[in-house]
A protein has these predicted regions:
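TRAFAC-class small GTPase G-domain
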Residues: 1-188
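C-terminal-of-GTPase-core extension/linker across diverse P-loop GTPases
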Residues: 182-202
């Protein structure tokens, strides 16, 4: 992200909905985003993550990007104040646990829910990013989920972006957050956030 300076402010917050099976790492991921602010890409977290509270939703992140300043408001399925199906997200983030194939298989159902609740009219109406969490737990052995497989699934689910990271170690967290911010910003432009030509891997 760019250094602070004179930027045009986007007044309306950009709403992001984080979906994924229970236990896939959503809460730790959101908490980790708070810890990486100001860190350089590739650096590791120096302090333990302090978990956010579900009752504090939406989780707010102030962004400076592409000479613009804007606010991300992120919700997940554990929001006790408002059921996620009643939201009107600008971007959907589909999350799974890289060490748990069941959570990867569950994304098909979540993607169907996105179409059911948020798609209006013909064609895709909302940008979707898929993110693999707990990257530090990817171990060789039976059931190993390779990046090539997850990219293929992201394409099959018609996602616009794919990224993976580890909130615990901080690996690729900055890159994943920047890509999410970029996708969110694109929803405020005439082009929108949908990717032409398929899923982009970060």
């Amino acid at each position: 992200m760019e250094t602070p300076g004179a930027r045009e402010a986007i007044e309306t917050p950009i709403t992001i909905l984080l979906l994924g099976d229970a236990g896939c790492g959503k809460s730790t991921f959101l908490s980790g985003l708070k810890c990486i602010r100001g860190q350089k890409p590739g650096s590791s977290l120096k302090e333990p993550i302090e978990l956010l509270h579900d009752t504090d939703q939406p989780f707010v992140y102030e962004i400076n990007f592409s000479k613009k300043s804007f606010t991300l408001e992120i919700y997940d399925t554990e929001n006790p104040n408002q059921h996620w199906t009643t939201l009107q997200p600008d971007v959907v983030l589909l999350a799974f646990d890289i060490s748990n194939r069941k959570t990867l298989d569950g994304l098909k159902g979540w993607r169907s829910d996105v179409i059911r609740y948020f798609q209006q009219g013909e064609g895709e109406r909302i940008p979707v990013m898929m993110v693999g969490l707990k990257r530090d737990l990817r171990k060789p052995g039976e059931g190993l989920i390779y990046p090539q497989e997850t990219y293929r699934i992201a394409q099959e689910l018609r996602c616009d972006r794919y990224a993976e990271c580890s909130a615990v170690t901080g690996e690729l967290m900055t890159q994943a957050f920047e890509d999410l911010a970029r996708l969110a910003y694109m929803t405020t432009t005439a082009e929108g956030g949908q990717t032409k030509g398929g899923c982009v891997v970060m």
